[in-house]
Amino acid sequence: MFGRKQSPQKSVKNGQGNAPSVYDEALNWEAAHVRLVEKSERRAWKIAGAFGTITVLLGIGIAGMLPLKQHVPYLVRVNAQTGAPDILTSLDEKSVSYDTVMDKYWLSQYVIARETYDWYTLQKDYETVGMLSSPSEGQSYASQFQGDKALDKQYGSNVRTSVTIVSIVPNGKGIGTVRFAKTTKRTNETGDGETTHWIATIGYQYVNPSLMSESARLTNPLGFNVTSYRVDPEMGVVQ
Protein backbone atom coordinates (compact mmCIF):
# COMPACT_ATOMS: atom_id res chain seq x y z
CA MET A 1 0.00 0.00 0.00
CA PHE A 2 1.20 3.30 -0.86
CA GLY A 3 1.04 5.44 2.16
CA ARG A 4 0.75 9.32 2.08
CA LYS A 5 4.08 10.85 1.64
CA GLN A 6 5.02 13.20 4.28
CA SER A 7 5.69 16.72 2.97
CA PRO A 8 9.16 17.98 3.80
CA GLN A 9 9.33 20.36 6.73
CA LYS A 10 10.77 23.79 6.08
CA SER A 11 13.81 24.09 8.22
CA VAL A 12 14.29 27.16 10.28
CA LYS A 13 17.95 28.02 10.66
CA ASN A 14 19.28 29.18 13.98
CA GLY A 15 22.57 30.65 14.92
CA GLN A 16 24.31 27.50 13.63
CA GLY A 17 22.85 27.86 10.17
CA ASN A 18 23.47 30.25 7.31
CA ALA A 19 20.48 32.57 7.77
CA PRO A 20 19.94 34.52 11.04
CA SER A 21 16.81 33.92 12.97
CA VAL A 22 14.43 36.67 14.02
CA TYR A 23 15.86 36.40 17.53
CA ASP A 24 19.40 36.95 16.32
CA GLU A 25 18.34 39.94 14.24
CA ALA A 26 16.71 41.50 17.31
CA LEU A 27 19.88 40.98 19.33
CA ASN A 28 22.01 42.54 16.60
CA TRP A 29 19.71 45.56 16.33
CA GLU A 30 19.73 46.08 20.10
CA ALA A 31 23.54 45.86 20.25
CA ALA A 32 23.88 48.37 17.41
CA HIS A 33 21.44 50.70 19.14
CA VAL A 34 23.38 50.48 22.41
CA ARG A 35 26.64 51.28 20.58
CA LEU A 36 24.96 54.25 18.90
CA VAL A 37 23.66 55.57 22.23
CA GLU A 38 27.08 55.14 23.87
CA LYS A 39 28.76 56.94 20.98
CA SER A 40 26.23 59.77 21.21
CA GLU A 41 26.79 60.07 24.96
CA ARG A 42 30.57 60.21 24.50
CA ARG A 43 30.15 62.95 21.90
CA ALA A 44 27.85 64.89 24.25
CA TRP A 45 30.36 64.64 27.09
CA LYS A 46 33.15 65.86 24.82
CA ILE A 47 31.06 68.86 23.75
CA ALA A 48 30.12 69.62 27.36
CA GLY A 49 33.78 69.37 28.38
CA ALA A 50 34.80 71.73 25.60
CA PHE A 51 32.19 74.28 26.66
CA GLY A 52 33.29 73.92 30.28
CA THR A 53 36.91 74.57 29.31
CA ILE A 54 35.91 77.64 27.29
CA THR A 55 33.87 78.96 30.23
CA VAL A 56 36.81 78.54 32.61
CA LEU A 57 39.16 80.28 30.17
CA LEU A 58 36.70 83.16 29.76
CA GLY A 59 36.45 83.51 33.53
CA ILE A 60 40.23 83.63 33.86
CA GLY A 61 40.43 86.19 31.05
CA ILE A 62 37.80 88.44 32.64
CA ALA A 63 39.48 88.17 36.04
CA GLY A 64 42.77 89.13 34.44
CA MET A 65 41.22 92.17 32.80
CA LEU A 66 39.64 93.51 36.00
CA PRO A 67 42.80 95.35 37.13
CA LEU A 68 42.79 97.14 33.78
CA LYS A 69 39.33 98.53 34.59
CA GLN A 70 40.33 99.77 38.03
CA HIS A 71 39.82 103.50 38.54
CA VAL A 72 42.88 105.03 40.15
CA PRO A 73 42.40 108.55 41.54
CA TYR A 74 45.08 111.16 40.94
CA LEU A 75 45.80 114.47 42.59
CA VAL A 76 45.95 117.13 39.89
CA ARG A 77 47.52 120.53 40.49
CA VAL A 78 46.63 123.42 38.21
CA ASN A 79 49.37 125.96 37.65
CA ALA A 80 48.10 129.31 38.92
CA GLN A 81 49.94 131.22 36.19
CA THR A 82 49.52 129.04 33.09
CA GLY A 83 46.45 126.97 33.96
CA ALA A 84 48.30 123.81 32.92
CA PRO A 85 47.30 120.69 34.91
CA ASP A 86 50.02 118.64 36.58
CA ILE A 87 49.46 115.11 37.90
CA LEU A 88 51.39 114.87 41.14
CA THR A 89 50.77 111.34 42.40
CA SER A 90 48.26 108.53 42.48
CA LEU A 91 46.13 108.31 45.58
CA ASP A 92 46.04 105.04 47.47
CA GLU A 93 43.25 104.92 50.02
CA LYS A 94 45.45 102.77 52.26
CA SER A 95 48.40 105.17 52.29
CA VAL A 96 47.03 108.69 51.77
CA SER A 97 44.07 109.95 53.77
CA TYR A 98 41.50 112.40 52.50
CA ASP A 99 42.48 114.92 55.20
CA THR A 100 46.12 114.80 54.14
CA VAL A 101 45.22 115.39 50.51
CA MET A 102 43.04 118.37 51.37
CA ASP A 103 45.65 119.84 53.74
CA LYS A 104 48.29 119.66 51.02
CA TYR A 105 45.95 121.25 48.50
CA TRP A 106 45.05 124.24 50.67
CA LEU A 107 48.60 124.76 51.91
CA SER A 108 49.88 124.87 48.34
CA GLN A 109 47.13 127.26 47.23
CA TYR A 110 47.87 129.56 50.14
CA VAL A 111 51.62 129.73 49.52
CA ILE A 112 51.14 130.28 45.79
CA ALA A 113 48.65 133.11 46.36
CA ARG A 114 50.72 134.74 49.11
CA GLU A 115 54.17 134.53 47.54
CA THR A 116 53.28 135.21 43.89
CA TYR A 117 53.54 138.74 42.57
CA ASP A 118 51.87 139.41 39.26
CA TRP A 119 50.49 142.85 38.57
CA TYR A 120 47.61 141.42 36.55
CA THR A 121 46.50 138.83 39.13
CA LEU A 122 47.52 140.75 42.26
CA GLN A 123 43.99 141.70 43.29
CA LYS A 124 42.76 138.10 43.02
CA ASP A 125 45.73 136.78 45.02
CA TYR A 126 45.23 139.51 47.62
CA GLU A 127 41.58 138.55 48.11
CA THR A 128 42.39 134.82 48.21
CA VAL A 129 44.98 135.28 50.95
CA GLY A 130 42.53 137.40 52.93
CA MET A 131 39.81 134.75 52.74
CA LEU A 132 42.19 131.95 53.76
CA SER A 133 43.79 133.85 56.66
CA SER A 134 42.80 134.70 60.20
CA PRO A 135 42.27 138.46 60.80
CA SER A 136 45.73 138.92 62.34
CA GLU A 137 47.54 136.96 59.64
CA GLY A 138 45.54 138.66 56.91
CA GLN A 139 46.59 142.04 58.29
CA SER A 140 50.23 140.93 58.38
CA TYR A 141 50.03 140.08 54.69
CA ALA A 142 48.17 143.28 53.77
CA SER A 143 50.76 145.46 55.50
CA GLN A 144 53.28 144.93 52.69
CA PHE A 145 50.94 146.80 50.36
CA GLN A 146 50.62 149.83 52.64
CA GLY A 147 52.64 153.04 52.79
CA ASP A 148 55.13 154.62 50.42
CA LYS A 149 57.19 151.43 50.22
CA ALA A 150 54.25 149.24 49.31
CA LEU A 151 55.26 146.25 47.20
CA ASP A 152 52.91 147.13 44.36
CA LYS A 153 54.34 150.67 44.23
CA GLN A 154 57.89 149.35 44.02
CA TYR A 155 57.26 146.61 41.47
CA GLY A 156 54.25 147.86 39.53
CA SER A 157 53.94 145.86 36.32
CA ASN A 158 57.72 145.76 35.81
CA VAL A 159 58.50 142.78 38.07
CA ARG A 160 56.95 139.35 38.26
CA THR A 161 57.51 136.66 40.89
CA SER A 162 56.36 133.09 40.27
CA VAL A 163 56.23 130.23 42.76
CA THR A 164 57.01 126.53 42.33
CA ILE A 165 56.00 124.16 45.12
CA VAL A 166 58.75 121.64 45.91
CA SER A 167 57.17 119.64 48.74
CA ILE A 168 54.36 119.80 51.29
CA VAL A 169 54.43 118.03 54.66
CA PRO A 170 51.38 118.43 56.91
CA ASN A 171 51.96 116.87 60.33
CA GLY A 172 48.28 116.34 61.03
CA LYS A 173 48.33 118.62 64.09
CA GLY A 174 47.56 121.92 62.43
CA ILE A 175 51.09 122.71 61.28
CA GLY A 176 52.42 122.26 57.75
CA THR A 177 55.81 122.74 56.13
CA VAL A 178 55.99 123.87 52.52
CA ARG A 179 59.23 124.03 50.55
CA PHE A 180 59.02 126.26 47.50
CA ALA A 181 61.10 128.19 44.99
CA LYS A 182 60.53 131.81 43.97
CA THR A 183 61.69 133.14 40.62
CA THR A 184 61.78 136.92 40.27
CA LYS A 185 62.50 138.70 37.02
CA ARG A 186 61.78 141.97 35.30
CA THR A 187 59.08 141.63 32.70
CA ASN A 188 61.22 143.24 29.99
CA GLU A 189 64.05 140.72 30.51
CA THR A 190 64.48 137.56 28.46
CA GLY A 191 66.56 135.59 30.98
CA ASP A 192 65.40 133.08 33.57
CA GLY A 193 65.46 135.55 36.43
CA GLU A 194 66.69 134.94 39.98
CA THR A 195 65.47 131.85 41.83
CA THR A 196 65.56 131.54 45.61
CA HIS A 197 64.45 128.64 47.84
CA TRP A 198 62.33 128.95 50.95
CA ILE A 199 60.57 127.01 53.68
CA ALA A 200 57.18 128.16 54.95
CA THR A 201 55.97 126.96 58.34
CA ILE A 202 52.22 127.38 58.48
CA GLY A 203 49.78 127.03 61.35
CA TYR A 204 46.24 126.34 60.16
CA GLN A 205 42.80 125.12 61.14
CA TYR A 206 39.37 124.55 59.61
CA VAL A 207 36.54 126.81 60.74
CA ASN A 208 32.81 126.35 60.27
CA PRO A 209 32.10 127.51 56.70
CA SER A 210 28.52 128.40 57.66
CA LEU A 211 29.96 131.39 59.53
CA MET A 212 31.54 132.71 56.33
CA SER A 213 29.99 134.86 53.64
CA GLU A 214 28.68 133.18 50.52
CA SER A 215 31.42 134.69 48.36
CA ALA A 216 34.06 133.40 50.81
CA ARG A 217 32.56 129.90 50.73
CA LEU A 218 32.88 129.84 46.94
CA THR A 219 36.62 130.37 47.32
CA ASN A 220 37.08 128.43 50.55
CA PRO A 221 34.26 125.86 50.91
CA LEU A 222 35.96 123.88 53.70
CA GLY A 223 36.84 126.85 55.89
CA PHE A 224 40.63 126.49 55.66
CA ASN A 225 42.17 129.18 57.86
CA VAL A 226 45.84 130.11 58.35
CA THR A 227 46.63 131.29 61.88
CA SER A 228 50.41 131.76 61.57
CA TYR A 229 52.89 132.05 58.71
CA ARG A 230 56.69 132.16 58.80
CA VAL A 231 59.11 131.98 55.86
CA ASP A 232 62.82 131.16 56.16
CA PRO A 233 65.52 130.66 53.52
CA GLU A 234 66.20 126.99 52.89
CA MET A 235 69.62 126.09 54.25
CA GLY A 236 72.02 124.11 52.09
CA VAL A 237 70.46 125.27 48.82
CA VAL A 238 72.33 127.60 46.51
CA GLN A 239 70.20 130.72 46.25
Curated annotation (Swiss-Prot):
Pfam families: VirB8
Residue stretches spanning the membrane: 47-67
Gene Ontology molecular function, alphabetical: identical protein binding
Membrane topology: Single-pass membrane protein
Induction: Specifically induced within macrophages by phagosome acidification. Induced at 37 degrees Celsius in minimal medium, suggesting that nutritional stress is a regulating signal.
GO BP: protein secretion by the type IV secretion system
Family matches, as InterPro entries: NTF2-like_dom_sf, VirB8, VirB8/PtlE
Main location: membrane
Entry's localization field: Cell inner membrane
The entry's keywords: Cell inner membrane, Cell membrane, Membrane, Transmembrane, Transmembrane helix, Virulence
Membrane as UniProt keyword: yes
GO terms under cellular component: plasma membrane
Miscellaneous comment text of the record: Transcription of the operon is maximal in early exponential phase.
Family: Belongs to the virB8 family.
Function description: The VirB system could be required for the establishment of the replication niche in the host.
Protein name: Type IV secretion system protein virB8
Organism of this sequence: Brucella suis biovar 1 (strain 1330)
